[in-house]
Every structure is written in structure tokens, then in C-alpha cells.
Amino acid sequence: MKVTLIAILTCAAVLVLHTTAAEELEAESQLMEVGMPDTELAAVDEERLFERSVSCEIEKEGNKDCKKKKCKGGWKCKFNMCVKV
């Protein structure tokens, strides 16, 4: 009984991992089909970095370290910048 249960759970875990990996590959292939050149991808990355640093609300008090406030819309403050979670 225990062996059967372990086998079923193992198969279920493998199926979930396989499905997740397949979805990631499909998403990557769709990005590649768009045909976006590397220079445009670099520009998008720069925009995201700017977006992260701008969307984080940080308050300075004199010479003290920054106090992190809550970021909005799925962003989390980390290292004085917002990071998408």
C-alpha cells in the first residue's frame, strides 16, 4: 500500500514538473518567434531596471539609512529598489 502511494505521488510530482518545464519552453519559443533583436531586448531590460528603481518609494531622514516603504503592484523593496515578486 505504501509503495503504491509513493509511486503515485512520485508520478504526480514528475508530471507537474514536466508540465511546468513545457510551459516555460513554450513561452520562450513564443518570445523567439517575435524576432526582437538583442538591442531591443537590452532596451527593455534597461526600462525594467528604471521601472524598478522609480516605483519603489523610499524616504530618507538626514544621514540615516533609507526606510523602505511598501512597494505597490506586486513589487517588493529590496536593496533600496523594488523587485518584481
UniProtKB/Swiss-Prot annotation:
Entry keyword Signal: yes
Compartments it resides in: Secreted
Disulfide bonds, paired cysteine numbers: C56-C77, C71-C82
A molecular function (GO) term: toxin activity
Keyword set, alphabetical order: Disulfide bond, Neurotoxin, Postsynaptic neurotoxin, Secreted, Signal, Toxin
Tissue: Expressed by the venom gland.
GO (cellular component) term, any one: extracellular region
InterPro entries xref list: Hwtx-2-like
Propeptide: 23-48
Organism superkingdom: Eukaryota
Keyword Ligase: no
Signal peptide: 1-22
Biological role stated in the UniProt entry: Postsynaptic neurotoxin.
Family indicated by similarity: Belongs to the neurotoxin 12 (Hwtx-2) family. 02 (Hwtx-2) subfamily.
Protein name (record): U4-theraphotoxin-Hhn1ab
